[in-house]
């Protein structure tokens, strides 16, 4: 069955559409009263349902109930409210066609120029652990129908699905109406919104996330419009942020101050979080171009930041800082004196936040409660998508490491080796990381051979390499890499092992009296 076709020569020109009548039905009441006030001040008739109508009416604004428009009461515990020709004819009438206008008059139906709808909180209900029957009740039917009808008819109707668009809508109403371009952009967001919603429902019925241990028939990603970004990785690239409606990460973080986040800011901040949140202890990671230039743990977060910054102060200039604890006033006082692009943490002491806000360009982000990395990750390639389990340390335990050279590490050295192994995972391959006293002192990242990574790490550590420990994200194919580390004074090395020349590598460490452990697990990061 196909939709009707119209002779486009019959279409009348319609760009700016004044708002005279609006249909509002929202679950999320954020910004509702300000929007209703702006519409009422402009003389717009507001038609609404249930609790939305009650909220607007209690604020002192006149509201027309949907039931008085349809002549049919809300029924079946609210399951049927707006599913009626008196509503949908007003949403779908294409008033560029004289015939549609005449039919509305014959039917006694008034058109809508604005629809404001957000859907039942299905994802939030699932996340709350609700029983199946309660989850099913949060599958919206009438809402998506109104959204899709309005978006289809964007030539005549503006559809708004997010409180983030209320301010722009109010400005358009005050300016005399919405333009065709505005309505088309809103329609695109609306269809993305309903697609993500339906995808969430389908995923729930299918049993949530795909099991990657078997071949899944289909992999779906759900994301909703978040915000436009000034540009992408470079100024000539367009970019935007889309957020997982069920996510609890950087895309959902609150910003307390500073300039707008950029594409590169988000990439670096996410990389910094990946580094800092590998540790149970207070930890700070400083990142530049998605690579750590300092990672450290300590008894308190301010000391962790001091140690992380000391690793490479030159590279830390203009970097992104992530902390896995509440930022204290002591840490804020130090950060305030360093040019930093982004600071992200789970919280801020009141005094710390006020101090940081004096840095007008510093982007201050606060993670949502319950921050967690996704269990799966994907990367787009030409013609498809790669999907994998996220690389993470589950119940980290070094007792399974194998001592292959030198003496057993004492408790202090063992703790440093464990720290170094975790920290190295956050470095782009080929990765070598030197550390001492719970802090990185030299990082060799992103080199195309492990010898160059060793050389880079040692050169950055300089005299701090003496007595330090080292980690390699993958095995050493030859003894030349460890020999560079040993010559610089490294006392212990941890690596996966698995090279066909492991015996040569082990012999080199043994001859130098250097402790070496094999973990049996690689941590490439590309």
From Swiss-Prot:
Keywords: Hydrolase, Multifunctional enzyme, Purine biosynthesis, Transferase
Reaction it catalyzes: (6R)-10-formyltetrahydrofolate + 5-amino-1-(5-phospho-beta-D-ribosyl)imidazole-4-carboxamide = 5-formamido-1-(5-phospho-D-ribosyl)imidazole-4-carboxamide + (6S)-5,6,7,8-tetrahydrofolate; IMP + H2O = 5-formamido-1-(5-phospho-D-ribosyl)imidazole-4-carboxamide
One CC-aspect GO term: cytosol
SUPFAM superfamilies assigned: Cytidine deaminase-like (SSF53927), Methylglyoxal synthase-like (SSF52335)
GO molecular function: IMP cyclohydrolase activity; phosphoribosylaminoimidazolecarboxamide formyltransferase activity
MGS-like domain mapped to chain residues: 15-161
InterPro entries linked: AICAR_Tfase_dup_dom_sf, Cytidine_deaminase-like, MGS-like_dom, MGS-like_dom_sf, PurH-like
GO biological process, alphabetically ordered: 'de novo' IMP biosynthetic process
Coiled coil: none
Enzyme Commission number(s) from the entry: 2.1.2.3, 3.5.4.10
Pathway the protein contributes to: Purine metabolism; IMP biosynthesis via de novo pathway; 5-formamido-1-(5-phospho-D-ribosyl)imidazole-4-carboxamide from 5-amino-1-(5-phospho-D-ribosyl)imidazole-4-carboxamide (10-formyl THF route): step 1/1; Purine metabolism; IMP biosynthesis via de novo pathway; IMP from 5-formamido-1-(5-phospho-D-ribosyl)imidazole-4-carboxamide: step 1/1
Pfam families, per database record: AICARFT_IMPCHas (PF01808), MGS (PF02142)
Similarity annotation: Belongs to the PurH family.
PANTHER family, per the entry: BIFUNCTIONAL PURINE BIOSYNTHESIS PROTEIN ATIC, BIFUNCTIONAL PURINE BIOSYNTHESIS PROTEIN PURH
Domain notes for this protein: The IMP cyclohydrolase activity resides in the N-terminal region.
Protein name stated in the entry: Bifunctional purine biosynthesis protein PurH
Gene name linked to the record: purH
